[in-house]
Structure formats: C-alpha cells, structure tokens
Amino acid sequence: MQMTLKLIYRANIFVVNRDHPALQMGRGDNNDIMVVSLFASRVHARVEARDDKFVLVDQSSNGTFVLPEDESGMQGTEIRLREEELVLSGRGWFGMGRSATKHGDHSVRYMLEAETT
C-alpha cells in the first residue's frame, strides 16, 4: 500500500508521494508552500519521500516545531528540530520558527493517508 503525505496551508492542499517526492516550504516566493510569516526562514524546511517514509528536514534559522496528534485529535508532545530530520507519522502540525500550538500563518497541517487506486 502506497502512502501520501497531505499538507494543508491556508486552505490549499499540497501532496508528497511517489509522483511528487519532495516539497519545499518557507517565506521565499520560490517555495512550493510560501509561508507568510516573519517567523519562517526564506528556505525553511523540506519534506521528502524516502522509500516508504516521509522525512521532514529543517533548514531554518529558528527551527521547525512538530506537534503530532492522535486519531482523536489529542495533541502529543511538541518536538523542535534545528538542522535535523524527523520521520513523520500520523498527523499533526508544523510550526515554522514558532510553536505549532499557536496555529496561525506560520502553521502547516500534515496528515499521512493511504493512496486509493
């Protein structure tokens, strides 16, 4: 079963999968997701499909915060990445340069889903 990573920012949906294996996020207008926030770096983070995993790669000055959620929407423990990588699972939020608990213009929603054929 193939998986897809769905990212939602400002009601726009972006997908990372075998056909689109990478996506760049940041404040600069050359990113796939242009994050409109002073907390975000110009080139902030990248999501890559690697084998059967999705990896978040922080490339920022202020770090990327990851706030996972379980199926019922309960939030887990927030993780701060600084020039690090994290294998993603389930669903949750990314905070670009600021805590993801404060949803706003710096926040991107993520969720892993099984592809339907």
Tell where the protein language model's regions lie, with residue ranges.
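Short, surface-exposed charged micro-motifs
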Residues: V15, H44-R46, V55
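Short, solvent-exposed loop/turn segments at secondary-structure junctions
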Residues: D32, F65-V66
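Short structural boundary motif marking the start of a folded domain
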Residues: M1-K6, P21
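Short, solvent-exposed loop/edge segments of extracellular or virion-exposed proteins
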Residues: I8-A11
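C-terminal boundary/linker segments immediately following FHA domains
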Residues: R18, M25, S60, V66-T117
